[in-house]
Amino acid sequence: MKKFHGLILTALVTCLIIPFSLAASAETNENGNNSTPTEEKTTDTTENIITEEKTEPAEPTKDTTVTPPQKSKVQTTIDITDSQEVYSYEQNSKIDLKDFTATLTDYTDTKLTNYRLAANSKLSTAQTGIQEVTLLGDNEDGKTTAVKLNYLVKEKTAQLTITDMNFDLETKIFTGKTKPFASVYMSSPADENFGEGTTTADKDGYFYAEWATTPKQITAYAFDESGNYSEEVTYQVPAKKQNEAVVTAPDKVKKIETKNAVKSATTKPTDVTKVTKDDKTDLPSTGDKGTEWIFVVAGVIVILVAVLLLRKRKK
């Protein structure tokens, strides 16, 4: 019985202790749960705030990066057409893309590579005046940049000259000097002595031409196979020999016929001969008329003689 009462007492004490221990543990759990969520919430809030601050400035930076392409579009064409004397050429002279690209950086302040002609652009010196052309090149970023420029085409100046002109009144040989092996065209005024022809200068540049008659003046200009030429010069042929210079011409000299020389040498003698033949053919008829008059006179004389003889017989 004593053991039984002891067990009951132990059970009662245990029942009294368990509620108090459960209550204490409950308070401890409540305090721990309240502090932990607060820290998590605080941490989460801080992280959200930091994330929002980073994302908001990032959007304006993206907007600012859009502007550089707009600036590059404005600068894709470089116009230097206001410098018309930068490049100049003579008419019909050679022109090449390298003529521009070699020094183009000095005028554009922009280094470009892989130069080429833009569409509908060409290089030509056929027409005089200011010509406009557009070139394309690649910058350091690989983007295409257009360079708009112009060049001046001037009228070609004479490269050859004709000097030492002389006309020998005795031999009628016209001489002068120009570039060796150049061609020389010469002509006289368009009158009765008009003549024209082309001769070639020798290895020393001297040229010779023999005229059929003596013209009043001779106009000449020289040109070569490269397209060079001289100014047109006019030589006034003197009426009398003005110097004692002796012209030593080669054996074969270009002969220039004139209209007057052709007529006097061929047409006129032929006409005279024809007229003479025609006159001779007419002479027989004129001779016949002369012979008739002789017979008439002879008949009159015979009649007079017969009359005289008849009178003598009557006496």
Swiss-Prot record:
Signal sequence range: 1-26
Record's keyword annotation contains Isomerase: no
Highest rank taxon of the organism: Bacteria
Topology relative to the membrane: Peptidoglycan-anchor
Propeptide residue intervals: 287-315
Compartments in which it is found: Secreted, Cell wall
Swiss-Prot/TrEMBL induction comment: Present in both exponential and stationary phase (at protein level).
Keyword terms: Cell wall, Peptidoglycan-anchor, Secreted, Signal
Residue ranges, compositional bias (Polar residues): 66-76
Basic and acidic residues bias (residue ranges): 51-62
Span list, region Disordered: 27-76
Presence of keyword Nuclease: no
Residue ranges annotated as motif LPXTG sorting signal: 283-287
Classification via InterPro entries: LPXTG_anchor
Chief place of localization: secreted
Pfam families for this protein: Gram_pos_anchor
Designated name of the protein: Cell wall protein Lmo2714
Residues with PTM Pentaglycyl murein peptidoglycan amidated threonine: T286
